[in-house]
Amino acid sequence: FGPRIMNSTAHDSCAEYLINKFRDYGLKVTEQDAMLDGYDGTPLKVKNIIASINPDSPKRILICAHWDSRPWADNDPQESNHKKPVMAANDGASGIAVMLEIARLSSVDSCFISKIKFGIDFICFDAEDWGTPQWEEEDNPDSWALGSQYWANHPHRSGYTANFGILLDMVGGKGARFYREGFSDYYASGIVDKVWSVANSIGYGNYFINSRGGTVTDDHKPINEILHIPTIDIVPYYPDCQSSSFGPTWHTTYDTMDNIDKDVLSAVGATLLEVIKNIKDE
């Protein structure tokens, strides 16, 4: 599709693809449309996509990621690229890929996930990455995560809640390691403990580092603060990367498939499946 930027044909085409994929896997899909203002007042045509397994089950968990692309590669090492769009293979597609694979497995009779009794809501948040670009003098923190802010204030179901939530952001980059994110520890340390323990128990402790990383304004923040659903962020932390603690391709023209590591994606996906399996067995 190319960059999935709001108000573009690529954005519309990608939304249609995601909706059809989730429906093909037998999930109930709800579309949430809104017109929201970007950091500079640009009207943005926003679409959150909610895909549900066992939609009528009262016990639910939430798994989410953003699907939009950043319009500007404002952290690119070449200043001439700063106003070019980001392909967003990692920062915009990797978390969605993990969710789609879990949804696919839910349609396979031989997989345990097809037999779970609780509900899972996969939410593809839009407009996460239209935040203030670096060339502006002041950053407005409320200009980020617009889709999740809107959903948290207007849930797709009245009175919606979930036992807990897991946000996936940039979960496919080369060299990615996932440290305990600050807001996650503040609002949902028990969920962080559970997920990191599961990762370690199945051999992925080298990816999930049980130490504090950064504190990230991300889609989990409004979910915690507005809906009070304890939600964590699986997000990479590169302590030795000079260009960004999110890694060398963050908000650059290098966020492409060439820089995706399937082993990182597998570690995150396998950990999530094991977390879900443990809920089933509780």
Pin down the residues of each PLM region:
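Acidic/histidine-rich catalytic neighborhood of metal-dependent amide-processing enzymes
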Residues: 83-190
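Extracytoplasmic/secreted proteins, especially bacterial periplasmic and envelope-associated proteins
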Residues: 9-29, 94-101, 146-150, 161-163, ...
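Solvent-exposed loop/turn segments at secondary-structure junctions
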Residues: 35-39, 55-57, 67-71, 127-131, ...
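Structural recognition of the beta-strand scaffold that forms the well-ordered cores
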Residues: 30-31, 50-52, 60-65, 88, ...
